């Protein structure tokens, strides 16, 4: 099979190799997927650059992908063969991810992809959409709540806005990019505020009204934590799904305690199978109804994996970066 791999950490153009290798056959309870698209996420790029030890002599990167089930192992329903699917956790604690023509994965890591969604869209679901759904719905229904989504122009954040809105929440978003304000509004945010505003707490309060903000979703939780604690309503919840810029923030514990605020972190790789199945069903339903815009910023062929990694590293984009595999 055609694949991209690396055998050392480093810059994408220095370490990513495109070539041929044999593909595995599915073991018991596994599924073999012929991939047509591979999603490139920030975590994939950081892993290649050396944010954590490789763990394996050779790594095929990327956790997300989409394609067709080609074969199944013992214990898996054979009627799955020929199904359109998206996959998750392809390279989580494994050597073989989705930057290849084939991947074998446990059945629980493979989810139905609606006909309404392209393979490129499917490859943008595993980490971004399931993270967004988990951030919104982890603690139950949000119908009637006001939810604040920081960094609303980010891939996960914009999906979270749509999922929260479809779930009956009223969504306020922040951004530091004026060019993305309308794009964020199009996702369902009723107000889009500049997170750099020194009066952001007051601006959010005015937008939220008397009910306040019951839930905050943040991909840079540490940087915004002090402000989020000031914003959140009594007994509200702050959900962090990332904190690269400020990985070890100070915590105003007493201020949190006297508002009985819940601060929770989530990691999509650790999702229970039942939760992942539930979120995948929600995402699939929204795709089928045409109410989930999964933005794809760029599609490139597998041979241009290094350029795809550079695009993700550059940061300023509208949506996911996808490799097509034909």
Where are these regions (language model features)?
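NAD(P)H dinucleotide-binding glycine-rich loop of Rossmann-like/cofactor-binding domains
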Residues: 78, 88-151
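Glycine-rich beta-strand-centered segment in the early N-terminal region that forms part
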Residues: 22-40, 49-91
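Short, glycine/polar-rich helix-capping loops at beta-to-alpha or helix-loop-helix junctions
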Residues: 98-99, 175-183, 248-253
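C-terminal hydrophobic helical "lid"/dimerization subdomain
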Residues: 1, 274-326
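Short glycine-centered segments of the SAM/dcSAM-binding site in methyltransferase folds
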Residues: 84, 146, 170, 236-237, ...
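Mid-domain Rossmann-like dinucleotide-binding core that forms the NAD(H)/NADP(H) cofactor-binding site
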Residues: 123-197
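Glycine-rich phosphate-binding loop and adjacent beta-alpha segment
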Residues: 223-292, 325-326
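Short amphipathic alpha-helix with an adjacent loop that forms part of the alpha/beta core around
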Residues: 199-210
């Amino acid at each position: 099979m055609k694949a991209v791999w690396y055998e050392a950490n480093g810059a994408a153009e220095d370490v990513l190799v495109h070539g041929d290798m044999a593909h595995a056959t599915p073991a018991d309870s596994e599924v073999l997927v012929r991939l047509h698209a591979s999603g490139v996420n920030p975590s994939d790029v950081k892993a290649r650059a050396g944010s954590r030890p490789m763990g394996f002599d050779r790594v095929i990167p990327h956790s997300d992908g989409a394609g067709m089930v080609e074969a199944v192992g013992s214990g898996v329903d054979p009627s799955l063969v020929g199904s359109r699917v998206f996959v998750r956790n392809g390279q989580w604690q494994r050597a073989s991810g989705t930057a290849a023509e084939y991947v074998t994965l446990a059945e629980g890591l493979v989810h139905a992809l609606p006909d309404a969604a392209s393979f490129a869209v499917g490859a943008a679901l595993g980490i971004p959409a399931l993270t967004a759904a988990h951030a919104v719905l982890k603690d139950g229904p949000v119908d009637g709540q006001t939810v604040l989504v920081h960094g609303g122009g980010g891939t996960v954040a914009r999906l979270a806005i749509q999922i929260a809105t479809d779930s009956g929440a009223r969504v306020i978003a922040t951004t530091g990019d004026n060019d993305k304000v309308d794009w964020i509004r199009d996702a369902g945010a009723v107000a889009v505020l500049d997170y750099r505003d020194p009066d952001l707490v007051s601006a959010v309060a005015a937008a939220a009204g008397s009910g306040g903000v019951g839930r905050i979703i943040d991909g840079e939780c540490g940087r915004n934590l002090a402000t989020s604690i000031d914003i959140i309503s009594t007994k509200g919840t702050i959900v962090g799904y990332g904190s690269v810029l400020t990985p070890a923030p100070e915590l105003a514990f007493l201020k949190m305690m006297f508002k009985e605020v819940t601060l929770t972190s989530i990691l999509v790789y650790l999702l229970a199978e039942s939760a992942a199945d539930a979120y995948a069903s929600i995402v699939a339903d929204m795709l089928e109804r045409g109410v989930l815009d999964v933005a794809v910023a760029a599609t490139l062929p597998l041979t241009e994996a290094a350029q795809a990694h550079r695009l993700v590293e550059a940061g300023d984009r509208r949506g996911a970066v996808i490799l097509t595999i034909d």
